[in-house]
From Swiss-Prot:
Keywords: Cell cycle, Cell division, Cell wall, Cell wall biogenesis/degradation, Glycosidase, Hydrolase, Secreted, Signal. It is an enzyme of class 3 (hydrolase). This is Glucan endo-1,3-alpha-glucosidase agn1. Its EC number is 3.2.1.59. Pfam families: Glyco_hydro_71. CDD domains: GH71. Its main location: secreted. It catalyses: Endohydrolysis of (1->3)-alpha-D-glucosidic linkages in isolichenin, pseudonigeran and nigeran. Monomer. Has a role in cell separation where it is required for the degradation of the cell wall material surrounding the septum (the septum edging) which must be hydrolyzed before full separation of the daughter cells can occur. Hydrolyzes 1,3-alpha-glucan predominantly into pentasaccharides. The gene is agn1. GO terms for biological process: cell septum edging catabolic process; fungal-type cell wall disassembly involved in conjugation with cellular fusion.
Length: 424
């Protein structure tokens, strides 16, 4: 494993030297960092750098303590690497048209050495905010008059890239926006994700001379009193990265590093989990997905149409129960969209040479012939069974391992995913 991490770090360094303008950042929920110290931030930043992620979009609300945690994040980034960039993503579903607060935060962090600048301006993003007019006639006039112009007059011009997804392509056409971050990272029906929106956004951004930031996410499941649904996520992480290599957007934002409540985290589980999410997050490590992304990140930065495979490994993920499983003590209903998921075990194998991949779950065993490059395999789930995985070459076993048991019921509905990886 140390050799794999060394190769990933080495290749990431080469990419940073030759493709400094192509960035992959991860969306980071500051609201989940109440117990964080500088060392927690340093750990996350080092983990991100190891797979080629260039920075964090710091999603923040209005709590005073979040400003202090962001201060720690900038301090940590400065101690780890001057190349790792941070920028604020104002969560306007919480802040809601507080121009003084927004200006104060931008000014506080604008001169930090790890602040992301784009086109010579402080990079600023949002989650939502397309209905905030700050008392003016429309959203562009409001954001320009209440936020952009005062900051520019104070010597802090901003490059403004909001996530105003409800406006569709109209978000890019807003005069106040220098770019657009799409939040359309998941299919909302039983169909697989496609890149139609990305192509449209990127083409429009090109014609307007603006920036398009495309979203990539591995999964989506939330089971809380105020939101309770799943999106079809089976092969989503691979589908989405293949689409990114095809579209080659200006920038990519991974959704997310640590949104535990929506199950699309790729960082280590640490900090504070949203109340009610512990039952479907604890024990569901997603770090395998982080390492899975590395060859795709490298390929994106090189402008390649296929992932750059320079190490061998097997990744797997699956849910803890079939979609028909019952919940024995759940106060919430069955999550909408849960029936869109497939009852399968998903296996992705990176190979430099041909190998045999054997996957077993209960009474089912299948051996697949793997070829150099990326290999995708599935086998059906069986309950009361722990899936096992073996990779062999020329009669010798390269790696083997077993994942957690699949069961026929749980106390609460859980459409989160177990993930794992075998390095060899």
């Amino acid at each position: 494993m140390k050799l794999v991490l060394f190769l990933v770090l080495l290749f990431s360094a080469l990419i940073n030297l030759t493709n400094a303008d192509k960035m992959v950042v991860a969306h980071f929920i500051v609201g989940n960092t109440y117990p964080y110290t500088v060392s927690n931030w340093e750990e996350d930043i080092q983990d991100a750098i190891a797979v080629g992620i260039d920075g964090f979009a710091l999603n923040m609300g209005s709590d005073a303590w979040q400003v202090e945690r962001i201060e720690d994040a900038y301090d940590a980034a400065a101690s780890v690497s001057s190349d790792f960039k941070l920028f604020i993503s104002f969560d306007m579903s919480i802040i809601s048209a507080d121009a003084d607060f927004i200006e104060g935060v931008v000014r506080r962090f604008a001169d930090k050495p790890n602040q992301l600048y784009y086109d010579g301006k402080v990079f600023v993003s949002t989650f939502a905010g397309e209905t905030d007019t700050f008392g003016y006639s429309d959203v562009s006039t409001g954001w320009d008059s209440a936020v952009k112009e005062p900051l520019a007059s104070a010597g802090y011009p901003i490059y403004f890239v909001p996530s105003w997804t409800s406006l569709g392509q109209g978000a890019l056409e807003e005069s106040v926006a220098d770019g657009f971050l799409s939040w359309n990272a998941w299919p909302t029906t039983d169909a697989d994700m496609n890149d139609n929106d990305d192509i449209g956004y990127q083409n429009l951004a090109n014609s307007l001379g603006k920036l398009y930031v495309a979203p990539v996410s591995p999964w989506f499941y939330t089971h809380l009193s105020y939101k309770n649904w799943a999106y079809k996520s089976d092969w989503l992480i691979i589908d989405r990265w293949n689409e990114m290599l095809s579209v080659q957007p200006d920038m990519i934002e991974v959704l997310t590093w640590n949104d535990y409540g929506e199950s699309h985290y790729i960082g280590n589980i640490q900090g504070a989990l949203p109340a009610g999410s512990e039952g479907y997050v604890d024990g569901f490590d997603h770090t395998a997905w982080r390492y899975l992304m590395s060859p795709y990140i490298s390929a994106y930065k090189l402008g390649l149409s296929e992932p750059y495979i320079n190490f061998e490994s097997l990744f797997y993920w699956y849910r803890p129960t079939p979609k028909s499983a019952t919940a024995t003590a759940d106060s919430l209903s069955y999550p909408s969209g849960g029936d869109y998921m497939e009852d399968e075990i998903f296996v992705l194998v990176y190979l430099l040479q041909s190998a045999e991949v054997t996957v077993t779950c209960g009474s089912t065993t299948q051996t697949f012939s793997g070829v150099p490059g990326v290999n995708q395999f599935t086998i059906p789930m069986e309950t009361n069974a722990s899936p096992s995985f073996t990779v062999a070459r020329q009669g010798g076993t390269l790696a083997s391992g077993t994942g957690p048991e699949i069961v026929d019921s749980l106390s609460i509905y859980n459409f989160n995913a177990y993930t794992g990886v075998l390095y060899f």
